[in-house]
């Protein structure tokens, strides 16, 4: 009875408030402004919480940072914030709804055809194909659920002793259908389909991150990885490391690390050398941590939403295994999240630092900023090497677009000495695919620019 009375009173107050807001424009403007300020204040508070990598430990940037948080000094400023992390978790969680929504659009378009055409589509099994495609999307979504659950679990574990962030972390978990009990995640409704809550942001970056898990860790894509890794490893083995001498203090840095395949291979190949990998994309970085720590293989359907140039539907729907059981975290590997141009090592007494870049330099909006950031590492070592392999396919609104020859001459102007420079552009000898579907009617390949330079200025 009391509960019912209280509910009626609250309802009456809400009705009165809504009536006042409709009739009183100044009050309406004040109320909207007040709500916006509350939301803005909450957003600003979250913006002041930084995420340290690779632990995902949260820190208030306005408070002093304890000395044991050493990786903070590797990314000097513009450290990723909590909204950077949570916004991309939402992007991941929207994958199923957006994917099935697109298939629904294809279904509705086909239904616009006349009766004869629709009857022929039924005989072809076209609508059945779209339904089966939804099943493929759901299987990918289950992998994404594992990535989200892993990330939330890591966030909880790394901040379990920081009560100031407990409420915020509980809220983040609840948004994704979890609650925290005794320090562990419990899924509230496994069948819940996460709705589309953000109108901004493309799902192409989610598809790309999933596909990169295959490219970096599936045997299917070893044909793409091996030429890159073999060149880099060969240069380090034969032209950087002194024969039989591992007493030198050496650091390998891999900018634009993606989901971490190259950096993990280098850390495994050279277990006595520290490897720092840096990745700017939150989605790629989340998948990088997942790959290093999940310890189980996952099956991904990387072509499920690629309708063009397919020979048969089974090829579009086929799965690849990302062999994460063979990965495992390496003690000499530090995967960092942030802008490479804000990176600097902790130690200043390295004998050699080796920049290992693959499919990286053409991502620069400002090539000179990339070059300056690489050259700035010279003050941390006696000898600075740069081993690069990849095309020059410019994107991201570049300020300059150099030819290979111009880039070579620019290196010389800036004080680099090339130990080797070569091109692979002969299609008869094999070019390099990049997330290529080798069963498709469209297969893209790149020529490669390979160089190994030493900075002498």
Curated annotation (Swiss-Prot):
Keyword hit for Phosphoprotein: no
GO molecular function annotation: S-adenosylmethionine-dependent methyltransferase activity
UniProt subcellular location: Membrane
GO cellular component terms attached to this protein's record: membrane
Record membrane topology: Multi-pass membrane protein
Keywords: Membrane, Transmembrane, Transmembrane helix
TM ranges: 1-21, 250-270
SUPFAM superfamilies per the UniProt record, alphabetical: S-adenosyl-L-methionine-dependent methyltransferases
Pfam families membership: CARME
Alphabetical list of InterPro entries matching this protein: CARME, S-AdoMet-bd_YMR209C_prd, SAM-dependent_MTases_sf
PANTHER family referenced in this protein's UniProt entry, alphabetically: AER338CP, CARNOSINE N-METHYLTRANSFERASE
Miscellaneous comment in the UniProt entry for this protein: Present with 981 molecules/cell in log phase SD medium.
Name of the protein: Uncharacterized protein YMR209C
Organism expressing this protein natively: Saccharomyces cerevisiae (strain ATCC 204508 / S288c)
Taxonomic lineage from the root: Eukaryota, Fungi, Dikarya, Ascomycota, Saccharomycotina
């Amino acid at each position: 009875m009391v509960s019912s009375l209280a509910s009626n009173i609250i309802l009456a107050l809400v009705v009165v408030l809504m009536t006042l807001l409709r009739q009183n424009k100044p009050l309406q403007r004040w109320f909207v402004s007040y709500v916006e300020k509350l939301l803005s204040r909450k957003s600003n508070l979250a913006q002041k919480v930084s995420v340290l990598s690779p632990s995902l430990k949260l820190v208030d940037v306005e408070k002093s940072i304890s000395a044991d948080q050493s990786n903070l000094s590797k990314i000097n400023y513009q450290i990723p914030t909590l909204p950077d992390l949570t916004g991309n978790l939402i992007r991941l969680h929207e994958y199923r709804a957006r994917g099935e929504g697109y298939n629904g659009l294809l279904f509705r378009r086909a239904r616009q055809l006349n009766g004869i055409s629709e009857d022929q589509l039924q005989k072809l099994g076209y609508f059945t194909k779209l339904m089966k495609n939804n099943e493929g999307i759901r299987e990918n979504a289950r992998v994404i659920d594992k990535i989200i659950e892993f990330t939330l679990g890591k966030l909880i574990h790394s901040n379990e002793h920081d009560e100031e962030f407990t409420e915020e972390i509980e809220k983040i978990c609840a948004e994704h259908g979890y609650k925290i009990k005794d320090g562990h995640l419990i899924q509230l409704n496994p069948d819940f389909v996460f709705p589309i809550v953000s109108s901004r942001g493309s799902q192409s970056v989610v598809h790309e991150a999933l596909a990169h898990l295959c490219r970096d860790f599936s045997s299917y894509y070893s044909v793409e990885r091996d030429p890159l890794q073999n060149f880099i490893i060969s240069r380090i083995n034969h032209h950087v490391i002194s024969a039989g001498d591992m007493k030198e203090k050496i650091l390998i840095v891999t900018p634009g690390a993606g989901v971490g395949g190259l950096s993990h291979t280098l850390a495994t190949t050279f277990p006595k050398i520290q490897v720092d990998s840096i990745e700017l994309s939150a989605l790629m970085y989340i998948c990088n941590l997942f790959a290093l720590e999940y310890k189980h293989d996952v099956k991904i359907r990387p072509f499920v939403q690629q309708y063009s140039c397919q020979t048969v539907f089974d090829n579009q729907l086929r799965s690849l295994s990302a062999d994460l059981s063979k990965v495992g975290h390496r003690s000499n590997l530090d995967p960092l999240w942030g802008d490479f141009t804000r990176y600097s090592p902790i130690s200043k007494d390295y004998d050699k630092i080796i920049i290992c870049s693959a499919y990286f330099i053409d991502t620069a909006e400002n090539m000179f900023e990339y070059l300056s950031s690489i050259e700035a590492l010279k003050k941390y070592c006696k000898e600075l090497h740069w081993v690069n392999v990849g095309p020059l396919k410019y994107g991201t609104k570049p300020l300059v677009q150099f030819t290979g020859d111009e880039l070579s001459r620019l290196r010389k102007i800036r004080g680099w000495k090339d130990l080797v420079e070569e091109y692979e552009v002969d299609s008869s000898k094999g070019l390099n695919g990049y997330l290529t579907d080798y069963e498709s009617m469209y297969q893209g390949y790149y020529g490669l620019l390979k160089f190994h330079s030493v900075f002498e200025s």
